[in-house]
Regions:
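Charged heptad-repeat coiled-coil "stalk" segments of single-pass membrane proteins
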Residues: 57-138
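Short amphipathic alpha-helical segments
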Residues: 14, 25, 32, 171-178
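Immediate post-signal-peptide N-terminus of mature secreted/exported proteins
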Residues: 16-77
């Protein structure tokens, strides 16, 4: 009977896990998701889309304003300018390698903290402080990466149709009969 109680207590204590386990798991999951979003964005071709936008922007800069082409300047160029600025902002914020390294480092830190907590190497207060520090470092980064990736995916969804549209516009610029 005594052994049965020991086994029951062992399972009850084991089922409890360690302090802040759920929060650590959530932070680890969110960090991994942000890293996957970032890697997926680059594998889906954001760099080639940006190169196309740069090409269209450089062509647009050569066009001289005149009344014949005023609608293009008022409408088409504004759309081009918006897409180009948003995409440029993405590449100016930080490189893929920079964001990946920050997220990967954060992921390593969370895993190390989980290991220390699981092994009982830290007391509950130290775990709480370390977890809060990780949250302070990672949550703004995760938020920025996820929102930026979502915005870039939205721009990329429109890219193919806009790329074709702008190419036709350039082709017809000098020769309206095309």
């Amino acid at each position: 009977m005594r052994n049965l109680w020991k086994i029951a207590i062992f399972f009850i204590v084991g089922a409890c896990g360690f302090p802040y386990e759920a929060e650590m798991n959530q932070l680890e999951s969110d960090t991994q998701e942000a890293l996957s979003n970032l890697q997926g964005l680059y594998s889906s071709g954001i760099e080639s889309d940006y190169a196309d936008l740069e090409r269209h922007a450089s062509i647009a800069r050569t066009k001289i304003f005149d009344s014949i082409h005023e609608p293009y300047f008022r409408n088409e160029f504004e759309v081009l300018k918006y897409h180009y600025r948003q995409t440029s902002r993405w590449f100016e914020l930080q490189s893929q390698a920079g964001w990946e390294s920050e997220l990967s480092y954060g992921l390593e830190q969370i895993k190390a903290l989980k290991h220390d907590a699981e092994q009982g190497l830290m007391d509950e207060e130290a775990i709480r402080v370390a977890l809060e520090n990780e949250k302070v470092a990672l949550i703004p980064l995760i938020s920025e990466v996820n929102s930026s990736c979502a915005a870039m995916r939205e721009l990329m969804a429109e890219h193919d149709s806009l790329d074709s549209h702008w190419q036709v516009m350039w082709d017809r610029w000098e020769n309206p009969n095309l």
